[in-house]
């Protein structure tokens, strides 16, 4: 399952699922992508289909492994990953080094176990007000789910996850 960033940073009022869907389509990717965010309807840990959570590695756009599987992100250790494996945007840029993302932080709105934090998810990702708060993770921690709180006006990285495995029919 691919973990890919949106092509630009966003504040807390992001229509992230739509953006993930649209940018994946424009990049020619065939499967469905959902935002790596907890929402008012769903905890982040349940975004990927149950049948695909345990045996499929999580990889970047180029197929390099970030996690053994989806469940391993939510083991309570904050989604520890190898910072030497880049996370790419849908247009192929490395979010860790590209200046288009001046703040190397990802929004997630979740606990370390991938459960929604209703007080810290920018009012279900509908506001960019400075007074509203969102849970996010600085990537230099080497974690996707580090527990830091930021104002929703910040423009951070939004990740998208391929939410079900589709094998290549030409494979």
Give the ranges of each region predicted by the language model.
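Secreted/extracellular ectodomain signature
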Residues: 1-171
């Amino acid at each position: 399952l691919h973990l890919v960033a949106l092509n630009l940073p966003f504040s807390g009022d992001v229509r992230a699922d739509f953006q993930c869907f649209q940018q994946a389509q424009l990049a020619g990717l065939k499967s469905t992508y959902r935002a790596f965010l907890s929402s008012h309807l769903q905890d982040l840990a349940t975004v990927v289909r149950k049948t695909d959570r345990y045996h499929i590695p999580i990889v970047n756009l180029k197929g390099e492994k970030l996690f053994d599987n989806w469940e391993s992100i939510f083991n309570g250790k904050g989604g520890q990953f190898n910072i030497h494996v880049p996370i790419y945007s849908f247009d192929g840029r490395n979010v860790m080094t590209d200046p288009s993302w001046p703040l190397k932080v990802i929004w997630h709105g979740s606990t370390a176990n991938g459960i929604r934090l209703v007080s810290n998810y920018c009012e279900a990702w509908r506001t960019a007000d400075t007074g509203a708060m969102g849970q996010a993770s600085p990537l230099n921690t080497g974690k996707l789910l580090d527990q830091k709180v930021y104002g929703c006006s910040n423009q951070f990285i939004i990740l998208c996850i391929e939410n079900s495995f589709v094998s290549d029919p030409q494979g």
